[in-house]
A protein has these predicted regions:
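Short amphipathic alpha-helix that is part of the acyltransferase structural core
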Residues: 1-39, 51-55, 60, 150, ...
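Active-site rim helix/loop that mediates acceptor-substrate recognition in acyltransferases
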Residues: 22, 26-57, 61-69, 197-223, ...
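A structural microfeature
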Residues: 62, 148-151, 234, 299
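Conserved hydrophobic beta-strand within the GNAT/NAT acetyltransferase core sheet
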Residues: 79, 113-115, 243, 277-281
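A short, internal acetyl-CoA/4′-phosphopantetheine-binding micro-motif in the GNAT/acyltransferase core
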Residues: 79-89, 118-121, 246-254
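Acyl-donor-binding surface of acyltransferase catalytic domains
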Residues: 90, 98-174, 302-306
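Conserved acetyl-CoA-binding loop-helix of GNAT-fold acetyltransferases
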Residues: 90-103, 254-267, 292
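Short hairpin/turn module used for nucleic-acid contact or packing/dimerization
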Residues: 254, 262-263, 267-309
Length: 309
């Protein structure tokens, strides 16, 4: 790295240049200034000391956005995005950014880094294998390893009808006492309690959907629940064309409740006027369920991690 390159914390005046560099480096996942502010800058855990930039003769030429959960007691951290301008690559700038950030995190007791899925504001569940092969090679050179390979999927809703097997599953579940239905206001507290117990990371997403569904404008969102004898055992939500999150109480899995929820949500999304459904993250095992409803793989990611010990 040349002597004119300086690594420092993010400053307010960097916004425009950082967004421009983000879009040049992470071209498959562009953002604008509004997304930068709403997702990251205004995140309660945002710390300029974990968002480092590199400048060359005063011009921004690299960045790495790291996040920790400020109120958490664990020792985890996340790399949400990073990049170096094409004209400054292979000069050690990326390594300097990461090394500086890792050193800062070690002093805070951080001992584990995941690349990608910082909740709630992750862009992708890892590094896109097709779009960013050089980034994967760089991370491997920095000591990161691939934990698993999640995929993103998409389905057309035009002409969608639930498969006969899903209809039969819904009928069987009803006979067993499990009912799938749209959420109503009386579900707010029970659903929040269900999420707190089974899917605490998704509570914020569900709360945001319920604020619109029951408090302002329901045109962009849907929410369905699965219940047995009045007890919520599963739920599924959508916002615009994005399906999920959704989940089922672990003790109720394997009975087809997830498939039944999916078969109810997709027609509801189409009724809202949306023509496709997509989501960012699932496993190959779960993808079998989605493929039965017309979903196809559109992206494949490397979920990478690194130990700082």
């Amino acid at each position: 790295m040349t002597s004119d390159v300086i690594v420092r914390p993010y400053q307010a005046a960097d916004e425009e240049h950082l967004v421009t560099l983000w879009n040049a480096s992470m071209w498959a996942d562009p953002i604008d200034a509004l997304a930068w502010r709403s997702r990251y800058l205004l995140d309660p855990s945002f710390d300029p000391n974990s968002c480092l930039v590199a400048t060359s003769n005063g011009a921004l030429c690299g960045f790495v956005l790291g996040m920790t959960q400020r109120e958490a007691t664990n020792s985890d951290a996340w790399i949400v995005g990073f990049g170096v301008s094409p004209s400054h690559r292979r000069q050690g700038i990326g390594r300097a950014l990461f090394t500086t950030l890792e050193d800062k995190w070690r002093t805070l007791g951080i001992d584990h880094i995941t690349v990608g899925p910082y909740i709630p504001s992750y862009v992708t569940p890892g590094v896109d294998e097709s779009s960013y092969p050089e980034a994967i090679a760089f991370l491997e050179a920095m000591g990161a390893t691939t934990l698993n390979r999640p995929l993103s999927m998409k389905a057309s809703l035009t002409g969608y009808r639930p498969a006969s097997s899903a209809v039969e599953t819904t009928a069987r579940l009803a006979a067993e006492g499990v009912r799938i239905r749209p959420a109503v206001p009386a579900d707010i507290l029970p659903l929040l309690e269900f999420l707190e117990e089974h899917f605490p990371h998704w509570r914020g997403d569900a709360t945001s959907v319920m604020l619109e569904l029951f408090g302002s404008d329901a045109r962009q969102v849907t929410l369905h629940i699965a219940e047995e004898n009045g007890t919520i055992v599963g739920y599924a939500q959508s916002r615009a064309e994005r399906f999920g999150p959704f989940g089922v109480n672990e003790s109720y899995r394997g009975r087809g409740i997830g498939a039944a929820l999916l078969a109810h949500v997709l027609p509801a999304m189409r009724a809202r006027g949306f023509h496709c459904a997509w989501f960012l993250w699932t496993s190959d095992r779960a993808a079998k369920l989605y493929r039965a409803h017309g979903f196809e793989e559109v992206r494949r990611f490397a979920l990478m991690e690194k130990s700082l010990t």
